[in-house]
Amino acid sequence: MIKILADDRIPFVSELFGDFGELILKPGAHIQNRDLLAVNALLTRSITSVDSALLEGTAVEFVGSATAGFDHIDSTWLKKQSIHWAYAPGANATAVAEYVLHCVAYLHKKNLLPRKSATAAIIGVGHVGCVVSDRLRKIGFTVFHNDPPRAQLEKDFISVPLASLANVDLVCLHTPLVKTGNFPTYHLIDNRFLKMLKPGSVLLNAGRGAVIDNNALLQCDHVITCLDVWENESTVNLQLLEKTTIATPHIAGYSKQAKLRATLMIYDAFLKYFHLSDTRRFSELQQLQETMTLNIQDGRNAEDILLTLFDPGRESQRMREALAENPDQFEYLRRHFPLRNEFSAIQLTPTPSALLRKELDDWGFK
């Protein structure tokens, strides 16, 4: 019998993994080495550091992380120990891209970003960056890419140098956090880059907090800042928080569909590793597959609809108020943040006009 220990916040972990052995659920922040001594499979999220301190001397042979990144996993050590591991790359790509669109809609409403002839730079064009690029193009942005490692691997990929991005209207960061090698991203956005950006340009980080030197950003007064990730999370620089136009607690990828996607990806890896058959209970997963109905009123445009679904300005104010009262509330806010529905899961009623339908199609509603 397989013994499985899982983070209790992984959606549908009981329904998917409960048939395969003994399943133990525990908060990810409280998982310790002694919990894993007789455990064969560990299912976790980014809140748990998976390294020698956690796994040394345990029976763990499979690690599944329901996350799009793996900064929290010591993959080198796991490989040396012949511990198989899997994660969920790209599971949250649509959710993050739609978070960016919500921010764009908010910035449009505040006249902080041009609606016509706007330009954007995507720094880090992997799973998420590709989707963000595609979605921005569909609403009229001219998009430039910066991803030197990808350009080195793909001869047809054009990576625009950072120094050529001084005049773009929107800079979106979607790189992993890399501290070594030929293409480090730690503090990639530094004082020099920030000074280069034109006044009024928007810097949006929904990747990794330490890709921006937050102290340099604190001294930067000519750029509009939108941050979902923060250097030294879960501690947030309160001075920087007050300067941001949009501030959220690392929730850009938080959609119901992204969470389910991530769980299913590690579920498939688990089945493959242990040579098991799929027993997923579709009826019990149905609620995350159903559409949400949203009533739209006459005269509304696509941006109004986006901001009805998720308003970054309102959420930013909520975060500021919460952290002003208690600076240690970041993880609480993140843990209890309501999951959004992706646009594909939203049914609009009554049927939009042909003009609004075209506008909604451009923004990604189908």
Curated annotation (Swiss-Prot):
Binding annotation for substrate: S46, T67, Y254
Keywords: Cytoplasm, NAD, Oxidoreductase, Pyridoxine biosynthesis
Molecular-function GO terms, alphabetical: 4-phosphoerythronate dehydrogenase activity; glyoxylate reductase (NADPH) activity; hydroxypyruvate reductase [NAD(P)H] activity; NAD binding; protein dimerization activity
UniProt xrefs under CDD domains: ErythrP_dh
Pathway assigned in UniProt: Cofactor biosynthesis; pyridoxine 5'-phosphate biosynthesis; pyridoxine 5'-phosphate from D-erythrose 4-phosphate: step 2/5
PROSITE patterns named among the record's database cross-references: D_2_HYDROXYACID_DH_3 (PS00671)
Coiled coil segments of this chain: none
Binding site for NAD(+): D147, T175, D228, G253
Active site: R208, E233, H250
GO cellular component: cytosol
Subcellular location: Cytoplasm
Description of how the protein assembles with itself and partners: Homodimer.
Family of this protein: Belongs to the D-isomer specific 2-hydroxyacid dehydrogenase family. PdxB subfamily.
Function according to Swiss-Prot or TrEMBL: Catalyzes the oxidation of erythronate-4-phosphate to 3-hydroxy-2-oxo-4-phosphonooxybutanoate.
Protein name: Erythronate-4-phosphate dehydrogenase
Organism: Coxiella burnetii (strain Dugway 5J108-111)
